Every structure is written in structure tokens, then in C-alpha cells.
């Protein structure tokens, strides 16, 4: 308790939400706020995140699927209608287009009569980690760092209560990072950002503490909650050291490690999903038990996220978990209950020492941006993820219901699976397209073009782009127009995949050896080495699964072709034809499989590749899996299919069947 005997204030409670349309998302937000949620966390759809309007060919199949589509100021007005932005704390998970979405938000507040200085919230804006994990980057690292820097400089002056960046270790853990890598990579990114702001000369040295004070972090918390809690204390210690020693920030309040958290969605299972509830609770303890390292904001995933899009009731359940812990227990009545624990202190010391060593290695490479451009960080994550997968497959790392205690009674919550998840209406895309076209038709076109011309000129002149972006928002410019203008100046970027021939992750099982021998025998029978194209169609940048399939396919003896993320069906077909592949493995997590996968299959057949096997992996409901099989997909794999070697065996069987060969003995 505080000195007056009162309980500590709880953290900000959010649920990560947004889908279909601004109007539907607005209704969801208002319902959640009535239920006691104390902040908003906005999920945007992939076209919005990657800078495309709903009517762009690149947006096909993606509109409204994983978040809300925001194409213009009108959409942002609808999203926050009836929600006073002078009192709301809003977190926006947005990166490459963060400057633009913030501009739309600030102008919406302006129209509500709210001064920009009153805004409270966070833009994720950690474009650096997008090259390593989520994949929603647009521009090369240099221009991306400029956008981050420009926004930080602007908000320090004009929105002092806004967190202009959330350095994200969350996605690094999902991409495979160990706790040491999570700390070191995130801290190296923070150093790159702070160095850029300092070196810009836009913030006087005596005010640099204000920059540091608005830096925030977004972290992950896994089920090993003792180690995870020690990780958070290690973050606190290293951040305090870096900001004092490197940047000379003497005010302890400005050096405070401020972070929000979502617990580990990657660890949620499709099999026995009811077990996810206790996983979520245990993971939350990692970021709440230790007062000295407690999260300032928490959002919990829903129990059924491995099955599909959660319903409002599922999100309410996650909110109630937070409320029970904060309001029914005595958690907030005590000082740090782990202070002086030799076990915790030993864990923290080990993590701090190893993280410092890794940070020093990255610094020797030239810092985080250089370590990304060289492929070092990405290859380290792919390697660590492959090792984690190998531990799960061998049973060394236990996942209850998946590789141990698999016997189960029928789950009544899944009796009607279609009702257990929310489905986005197919008309959402049509409505969004009509909306953005109507918006363009009614705006002052000359004002919009003038604003875009200023944006173009400022980008070329190395002027801070925030003012021009605000002008664009007021003039009715669209998301795609803003991003396309900068694409023409900065160019687009394709990040290293991290998939290398040297990665084997210690996998040397009898099962893998048998599959490898069968792959080689099949190739000999067909007179060629079997070729496997791993493909990521659409705008889905979550490449972790695709990378692990590429690694295991190579270990199993296939010649692997993997060109990275964000490909059109036409590009995938062209690659399959050029490389004369035997298998096209499509990885897709955005819910756009019903639109994009049939387009790939049809393209392959039109190109005469009738014997090429198509398999699909992702979060795909049973009804959709049947839909895909009816359209020529040989096999569909979902999160329950955790054994990558078994997947390779099944793929080989499909190849042999397509070529008229009997199943291989293994």
C-alpha cells in the first residue's frame, strides 16, 4: 500500500480489438469501456498497416480481417465517435504507417475540440522489429528510422503525454527469441532510436530526458513465469543503466522502465484450448507479481485465438481475468514481495550479464540497423525458434494437451465450432471500397494534391514529416496515397529471411532420417531432386511458421525456395513455374485463405502445373479447410500439427500420390 494505507492503482486494462469496419469496432470499444476496460488497444487490418487503400489490388482478401480498416479521416472519425479523446488512453498497434495513423487521430481529436497536448496513448512505431517478426514494414531501415525520429521529436514538443514509440520485445519472443535475445535485441533497438533522435540535433541536450521519459516498451510474458519475472527486472536494471550512462539522464523518474504487455499468444494451443485460460493467468503473474517491475498496461489474448477471431464474450472473459486479479486479490497491497530473494536476484544477474554481452556484440556490428541489414538478428531468431520447435517435438518442452496428457473429454465450448469464433462478413471489403471511393469523390481534390506535394517535397528535403502528414489528414488524403508518396521517395524493402542451409537446430531423429531417405528415393524415382516452394501470399507478415517449414523441408532433403513475405498469387505462380517445383506450401495467418489460396491453385493449373501439390498451413477453421480441399488443396495443417517432421512425411505422401507412386515406407 502507499503511505496513506491505500491500495496501489491498478494497471491500464485493455483488450486488443478491431475488426470489420470502423462502425463495428466503435461499437465494440464502447461496450468494452462500459464493462470496465480502462484503455483502448486498436488492431488495424493489414492494408492499413502496410499502406494500401481497400481498393488496391494488394488489399484483396485482407480488408477488415485482422483489424479495422482505416483509409481516411472519415474512418477515424467513425472509429472514435462518442469516445472523448481528451480522457481516453489509446494504444495503436501500428508501425510503418504510425505517423499517418497518429496524424488522423490527432486531427480527429482536433475536430472534437481537444488540443494535441492533451492526448494520451501510444503508437507502437517500432518499425525496426518489423524486419524481424511481424513483417509490416514498407520502407528500408534508414527512412523508417527517420519516420520514428520525426514522430518522437514532434510529440515531445506537441503531445508530451503521448508515447511515440513502443519498443517491442513481444514479437521477438514469438519469432523465437530467448529471454537474453529478447532483452538484448529490444535494448539495441532502443539505443538505435535514441541515438537517431540525439544525433538529429532537434532536441536540446537539456531536454533529452523528456525523450527518454516517453519511451515505452511492449513485452511478452511466457508460461515460465518465474524466469519471465526475472526478465522484467533485468529490463528495468539495464534500461536504468543505459539511460543514465549513455544519455546522461539524471532524473530517476525519466529513467523508469515503462512497459505494457500482452501475454504469449504463440503459446496458446488449438488442441484442448480450454488449457489456454490457465496459461493466460500464469503468464499474467509474471508482469504483475513484482511491484518494482510491474506492467503499466496489460492486454490479454482470448482463450480461443488459436482457433480464429475471438468474439466479444471471449474478450470480456480476458478482461475479467485482469479485474479479478486487480480487485479481488491482495496483490496491490504490498511492496515488492521478491525483494531480497537470492533465487530471483541470481536469475536477474545471469540475464543481465548475458544480455550485456549480446548487446556488445550487436554494437560491434554497427548497432541494431546494421545487425538487421546483415541478416544477423533474423538468422539468430530463426535458429532459436528451430531449437524451440525441436524441444517441443522431442517432448523435452512439455505442452499439456499437445505432447503430454493428450487424452481428453469432448469440449462443450467447441460443440459448435463455427459459433466459437467470430467470422468477418464478406461484404466488409465491398463496403470499405465503396467508402474510400466516395471519400475521394467528395473531398477538395486540389487541397489533397497540394498536401501530398508538400509531403513529397518535405521527404526529399529531409524536413520533419509530421507537419506535412497532419496537413494530409486535414486535406482528406488516404492511407494508400500517403504511403505511395513516400514509397516513390524512399523505395520499398525486402528483409533477409534468416533461412540458411546451415540451420539444423540439432534435429537428428530417426523419423527425420527416414523422411529424408524417402525424399531422396522419390527424387531418384522421378529423376530430379524434389523442390518445395514455401509461399506467403497477401499482406500477412507473420513468417515464423513459414521459416520453420522451410528449415525442416531443407533438413528433410527438399530443395527449398523461399522468397519471403507479401507476394501476390501471380508472383507465387510465376516462382513455382520458374523453379519447376513439386510442392507449393502456403502459409497464411490473416484469415484471407479463402480468397488467396484458390487464386494460387487456379494459377498453377492454368500454367499447366497439374502435378504440383499445394498444401496450406495457418489458423484455418474446419469448414474452411474443407472449402480449400474442394478447390484442389491436398492437405491443410493448423496449429495442432506441431510436428514439422510428420508434416514433411505427409507432404511427401501427397507428392508421390500426385505422381502415381505408392506411399513410401518409413
Model-derived features: positions:
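Flexible glycine/proline-rich, aromatic-decorated loop/lid segments
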Residues: 207-211, 249-263, 271-304, 310-331, ...
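Short beta-alpha connecting loops at secondary-structure transitions
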Residues: 60-65, 90, 129-139, 172-176, ...
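Cofactor-cradling patches in redox/metallo enzymes
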Residues: 546-652, 656
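Conserved, mostly hydrophobic/aromatic
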Residues: 36, 72, 113, 239, ...
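The C-terminal output helix
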Residues: 652-666
